[in-house]
Amino acid sequence: MNATNTAARKATWAVPAVLILLSLLFRLPSLVEGGGFGRLVSPSLDAALLALAVCLYTWAGLPGFTVVGAVLALLGVTVLSFQAADALIPLFFNRPFELFTDITYLPDLYALLRDTMSGWMFYAGLILLVAGLGGLGVGLYAGFRHLRRGFQDRTVRYGFLILLAVLVVLDLTTQVRFTANTAVPRMAEEAGKIAKKEQFVQEQQEAFSRQVQDSSRVMRPLEGLEGADVYLFIVESYGYTLYSEPMHFSLIEPELRQFQNRLTREGFRIASTFLDSPAFGGNSWLSDSTLATGVRIDNEAAYDLLHESDVKPIAQFFNEIGYRTVVAMPATTYAWPEGEFYRFEQKYYYKDFDYEGPNLKWAPMTDQYVVDFIHRNEVQGASQPLFIQYVMISSHYPFNMIPRFFEDWSQIGDGSIYHREDSVNVLPIKPGNQTAGAEGFVAAMAYELKLIREYLSNFVEGEALIIVVGDHQPYSGITGKNKPRSVPLHVISRRSDFVTPFVDRGYSEGLIPRQELPHAGLETFLPSLLESFSSVELASDPRSAAVKAGRATN
């Protein structure tokens, strides 16, 4: 009898301990959002609801608990995973978590980590993740069993229900926000978006139809270029912060001045602006496809729909007027059949570069090697005007492996020179940090800008039009929280009249953009390019507004 009483007392005292641990567990994601200790210790409604389910099941006297406990544990893991994503996505990508679209990134994330991490590290991390989620589920199940034993005591059940009632009353009459400490409304919101999938698809297809209609009005596209070569450099992580944050700007300003002064002396005219990218901190393909099509592609679902549409990408306009269209994408290390949509005549992916140098983790090869390879294989001896798009990668997160720039381009060869110890500057990542910080970020940007400057100065002859644009801001650990998505865009040419249409549109003279927030969308660039050099004027601004309006309803 005494043993029975002792067990009952232990079960009774276990209830408050389990409730406190559950509440702390479900409030852990709040630390990411800020608010400190106060938010952590505020009671969790999610934990209370799960405990209430155990209480009511026990009170009803229903037999068994194994299946119910497992279901509640699975539900708890699901809620915690949702809370973690809801806290971390805004931190890294400066946008809300969207279950409908973000869950589709998981296969790409898996492939990216598999390709960029060493084998043992990747599989060890995968095992730890599975073990962690499994351990979390087992821990929750054990906690719920403790609650069930404790709730068999009527006094404990009543005490728990009274506690819930007190918390609800305090929520209604004071500033204690018990009912706000839950993921339920956000989960319901995301479930509602999934239910509206058909509406989203219809709105996106309407946006694509507008682009197709506009494209059909361009009978002689880009004839104003008069056969001049066009080079498009899309620079990884080249964002607004480089110009707007005083610390970043002070570090990069010498390179910016050198870039402008060098090219101006050699007869180039430069105009610059900021445009609002659909991506932040990653997801470069969204900004690349937005730039290529003139339709804002701001999530994976829209990206997939785009590839099934009749939208005409930028390369096709050049194809139609006799250009050879080339894209260089060294970071594309696996089969990418969707690339056919973009209509490039010649595509260079990782396997096509004959690179014999080291893999620099996130950057499989250096951008100077890529530019040199394309110049030797495409630019030299070209018999057609060229449209070449470079998707640059050396400035990728975590900004800690900065290639050496070789003044003598003939040294680059097959890339094996990068095996030399002095060919890559490896910056330290301090314990607890994810990147090489502002120093690494600015060093990566300086490398890319110097590479473009030196290539234009030494190898681009004649009347070419050069476009340099960022794909997205670096992640929020570099920019800070709640920063704009804007990226710089520069148009450069020795033909002043190629730059004039952009200045007339509000671009700033020179390399440093001056436009105030808010900025026009990245999707406006292709229409403006077509308007500037084609004989038919497009309704670019209304279309852009319509696309944004459609997006706002999602």
Predicted features, each with a name:
Residues N2-R186:
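Transmembrane and membrane-interface helices of multi-pass
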Residues A8-L19, V156-F178, E198-A207, R220-G224, ...:
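Short N-terminal signal/transit or membrane-insertion segments
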Residues A11-V41, M117, A183, M187-R217, ...:
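Short secondary-structure boundary segments
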Residues S42-L45, L49, L72, F82, ...:
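Generic detector of well-ordered alpha-helical segments enriched in charged/polar residues
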Residues A85, Y105, Y110-M117, R148-F151, ...:
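Generic secondary-structure transition motif, activating predominantly at the C-termini of alpha-helices
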Residues P96-D102, K193, S284, Y349, ...:
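A diffuse structural propensity rather than consistent per-protein peaks
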Residues L106, L164-S237, Y243-P246, P254:
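Membrane-interface segments at or immediately adjacent to transmembrane helices
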Residues Q213-A228, L232-V235, Y240-N554:
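Solvent-exposed soluble domains appended to multi-pass membrane proteins
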